[in-house]
């Protein structure tokens, strides 16, 4: 079903379906089906953004829509340049006059000239990109602006919750947590790392952790890549955390923690199962609302796969511990050594009086390769996660990790495979070789290219287009692996190229260890039928968009719901699940996330797009990360990557183009949103 389009100005075109019944003016590039419902039974009445504006049937008056938009533009302007700082004010004031019935007294030609100056002279995207709607309205629908009758005002629209907006950018939309990247970069440029950290703490407490191991989807979307290279966003995030010199747990004081948010019943208890990124972030947001939380963790330390699956040369243990302690700082409790399915079941928790449960149990079970006649008990044949866990647990013993006495072959080329091969390199006997074999080409490898580069620098060999055929075992011990060369097929209709074995190309790599790092899955044995938890055909927990499961009061997120993904996605889902749990405990109604829905519209309508620079920019080299010498670092567990200096961070932050875009929609009915605000929380 499509919404009935009325009129608008979109991508430089005047569109008007009001004058004739059979008019066929339709916006090009905007999927009208997205306007049919913002949330259930609630169609859009307008869309406004850098491309212009679209008005659908039963919409507010155009002046009201524009006034709301430019009031937002004024508040989102960084204020660093006159065209945007003053232009948004002048446009908003003109539209206020129009809303109040004085549109005929406004010099709209002068307002158009102001908007044109904004469009070419502003320093950031708010000014550069927000001029188009008013220019289109003045050029094509001036009669609407010159109204002499007062119309429903801005506050009426916003108070009725029929207006949803966001100031966003490619990096923000690419980040699953929708972190305001340009804002924290601004603070770093201004020498205020504590404020930069504050921006990040609005989303998650694992700031230094994410600043070290995030897979950086924001950088892949950074508009600066069209000029030379993306901003070093992850390094800047780490800089903010490093400059403070303390973990996020030490940034909160008791005065901020003791008052529940409005509508919160402090007697309602929540159990979070799993102290990984999703569970910790879920607990963090619930605790900040004043809700009691207990976190059940089968290990003796918090962090989940960030603690046990990421080696300390990438993520120092003290850094992670200083951030996972936030749960205790905020009044929550860790219950270590308690595993779901072994020590308790869901019914036990509910019988103990917990009002809601969050399942953040991750995907901690590795997979074997599965070739014919595979001996999974062969000595030297390991699953990747088992190997990493064994090494991590042995780090705290006097003996340390057990040396690997022979060559090692790692199968797979994801980030877990990179952690496995680089960990093996640190404990293998001198003179032994570590090899990575992957069935596709290097460009198809899911691992971070930086990790592949670092592994190569440490002397690890790669065999691409090579797939395992059988593991060679003698007397119960691995002695080698047989691989077969693969070749790429011609691209299919979608452009994808498959790989197929090359007949007669088999070869053997003698080795004492084969580590299978080809993926992980959730351990289904933690559940019993009485738990009532439905699983997908992929073996993950079946959830809805609001993170509810098949059992009332039980929610799930992170890898347990998505399959093995990324730390940043797990944290984003932990935050969203906390909001959903909060809504459930207040009303027993399902939660709806307006910002998430707006992001879906932004993506499908390509409202942000590639954001190529509109003006020539000087070539400015990206910050170059500093690493320990490969030969020296491969013999120890010290953190490999160094930190930015204050001056390096300042210079890198100045490369940010702040390519923000303001996008808004109005709806026919109120949007029932759920965005709880923690009491006494600082605003950044």
Describe the role of every protein-language-model region.
Residues 1-159:
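Redox cofactor-anchoring modules in respiratory/redox and cofactor-processing assemblies
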Residues 71-93, 116-135, 164-183, 205-227, ...:
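Local cysteine-cluster metal-coordination motifs and their immediate loop/turn environment
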Residues 177-179, 189, 193-259, 328, ...:
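Glycine/serine-rich phosphate-binding loop and adjoining beta1-alpha1 elements at the start
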Residues 179-183, 188, 230-233, 272-340, ...:
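Beta1-alpha1 glycine-rich phosphate/pyrophosphate-binding loop at the start
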Residues 241-263, 325-342, 366-427, 535-550:
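Glycine-rich dinucleotide-binding loop and its adjacent helix/turn
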Residues 264, 268-273, 321-371, 470-482, ...:
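Feature captures the FAD/FMN-dependent oxidoreductase FAD-binding
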Residues 377-405, 471, 491-564, 611-613:
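FAD-site-proximal beta/loop scaffold in flavoenzymes
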Residues 560-591:
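A conserved FAD-binding loop/helix module that cradles the flavin
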């Amino acid at each position: 079903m499509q919404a009935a389009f009325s009129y608008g100005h979109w991508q430089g075109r005047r569109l008007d379906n009001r004058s004739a019944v059979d008019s066929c003016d339709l916006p090009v590039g905007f999927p009208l089906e997205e306007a049919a419902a913002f949330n259930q039974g609630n169609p859009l009445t307008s869309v406004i953004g850098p491309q212009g504006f679209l008005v659908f049937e039963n919409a507010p008056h155009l002046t009201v829509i524009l006034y709301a938009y430019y009031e937002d533009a004024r508040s989102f302007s960084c204020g660093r340049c006159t065209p945007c700082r003053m232009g948004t004010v002048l446009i908003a004031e003109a539209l206020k006059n129009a809303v109040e019935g004085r549109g005929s007294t406004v010099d709209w030609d002068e307002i158009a000239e102001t908007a044109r100056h904004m469009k070419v002279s502003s320093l950031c995207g708010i000014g550069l990109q927000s001029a188009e709607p008013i220019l289109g309205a003045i050029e094509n629908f001036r009669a609407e602006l010159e109204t002499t009758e007062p119309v429903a005002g801005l506050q009426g629209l916003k108070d009725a919750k029929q207006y949803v907006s966001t100031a966003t950018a490619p990096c923000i939309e690419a980040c699953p947590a929708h972190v305001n990247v340009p804002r924290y970069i601004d603070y770093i440029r201004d020498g205020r790392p504590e404020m930069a950290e504050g921006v990040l703490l609005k989303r998650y407490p694992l700031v230094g952790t994410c600043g070290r191991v995030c897979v950086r989807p924001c950088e892949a979307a950074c508009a600066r890549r069209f000029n030379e290279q993306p901003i070093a966003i992850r390094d800047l995030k780490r800089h903010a955390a490093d400059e403070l010199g303390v973990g996020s747990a030490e940034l909160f004081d008791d005065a901020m923690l003791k008052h529940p948010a409005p509508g919160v019943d402090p007697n309602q208890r929540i159990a979070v199962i799993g102290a990984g990124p999703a569970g910790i972030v879920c607990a963090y947001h619930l605790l900040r609302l004043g809700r009691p939380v207990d976190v059940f963790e089968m290990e003796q330390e918090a962090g989940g796969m960030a603690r046990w699956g990421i080696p300390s040369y990438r993520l120092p243990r003290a850094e992670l511990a200083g951030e996972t302690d936030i749960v205790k700082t905020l009044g929550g409790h860790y219950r270590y050594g308690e595993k779901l399915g072994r020590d308790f079941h869901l019914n036990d928790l509910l019988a103990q009086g917990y009002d809601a449960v969050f399942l953040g149990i991750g995907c901690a079970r590795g997979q074997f390769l599965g070739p014919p006649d595979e001996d999974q008990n062969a000595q030297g044949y390991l699953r990747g996660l088992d190997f990493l866990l064994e090494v991590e647990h042995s780090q705290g013993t006097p003996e340390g990790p057990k040396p690997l006495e022979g060559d090692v072959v790692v199968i797979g080329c994801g980030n877990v495979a990179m952690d496995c091969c680089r960990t093996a390199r640190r404990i293998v006997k001198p003179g032994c070789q570590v090899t990575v074999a992957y069935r596709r080409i290097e460009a198809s490898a899911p691992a971070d290219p930086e990790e592949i580069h670092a592994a190569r620098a440490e002397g690890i060999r790669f065999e691409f287009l090579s797939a395992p055929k059988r593991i060679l075992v003698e007397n119960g011990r691995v002695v080698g692996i047989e691989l077969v060369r693969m070749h790429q097929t011609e691209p299919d209709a979608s452009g994808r190229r498959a790989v197929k074995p090359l007949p007669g190309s088999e070869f053997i790599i003698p080795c004492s260890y084969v580590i299978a790092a080809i993926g992980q899955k959730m351990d289904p044995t933690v559940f019993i039928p009485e738990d009532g938890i439905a699983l997908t055909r992929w073996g993950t927990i079946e959830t809805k968009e609001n993170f509810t499961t098949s059992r009332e009061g039980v929610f799930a997120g992170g890898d347990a719901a998505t399959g093995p993904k990324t730390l940043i996605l797990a944290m984003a889902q932990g935050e969203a699940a906390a909001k959903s749990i909060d809504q459930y405990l207040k009303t027993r109604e399902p939660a709806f996330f307006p910002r998430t829905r707006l992001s879906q519209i932004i993506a499908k309508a390509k409202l942000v797009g590639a954001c190529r620079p509109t003006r020539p920019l000087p070539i400015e080299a990206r910050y170059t990360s500093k690493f320990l010498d490969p030969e020296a670092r491969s013999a120890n567990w010290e953190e490999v990557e160094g930190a930015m200096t204050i001056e390096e961070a300042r210079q890198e932050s100045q490369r940010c183009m702040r390519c923000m875009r303001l996008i808004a929609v109005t709806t026919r009915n109120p949007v029932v949103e759920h965005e709880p605000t923690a009491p006494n929380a600082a605003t950044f």
